[in-house]
Amino acid sequence: MRKTSPLLLTSLAAALALAAAPAMAQSKGDWTIGAGVHQVAPKSNNGSLAGGTLKVDVDNDIKPTITGEYFIADNLGIEILAALPFKHDINIAGLGNVGSTKHLPPVVSLQYHFNSAGKVSPFLGAGINYTTFFSEKTGGALAGSKLKMEDSWGLAAHAGVDFAINDKGSLRVDVRWMDIDSKVKLDGEKIGTVNIDPLAYGVSYVFKF
């Protein structure tokens, strides 16, 4: 269930205040580590189950994240995203909350950084996402049933801006899109696919070494 993220607006305002800081250039062989927080906001329409009779809605969640990026060339890096498990409540129209699940969505991306020697450096990336679901629980109208959500592979896109704090660190504001579609089983029977396809808004501190 996608909503406007106050986290993104607040972090963008803070980043603009740092625009006068020294630049953090990124060259071949450099490594960066980023630590921050992201809100995973599934798209507003998460699909239907049981032949289209049950409309699904998956809630947002926010958790700490970490990234590591290695620059294979000047301005061009390979990044890995990891996070603490995100937890989402699952709602069905007319039935309310019927369960929850946790997931981990690691992403590997190839990213190009524009103006990496400047104080403000936007970047774009594309890659692959693998999402694993676990700790599924049921409640409400589905209490007592066994819910299983299958793992998912999909494409991912990444865009953001780095605002240099000094020559070793920057404040990053970014947004990701991930293609996450999970086949759902209830008591061992396939009942459809949940289309999560979230945007992940975030802010982090990125350190170069």
Q: What is each of the regions a protein language model found here?
A:
Residues M1-G29:
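Cleavable N-terminal export/targeting peptides
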Residues P106-V108, G125-Y130, D151-V161, V175-W177:
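Hydrophobic alpha-helical segments of small multi-pass membrane proteins
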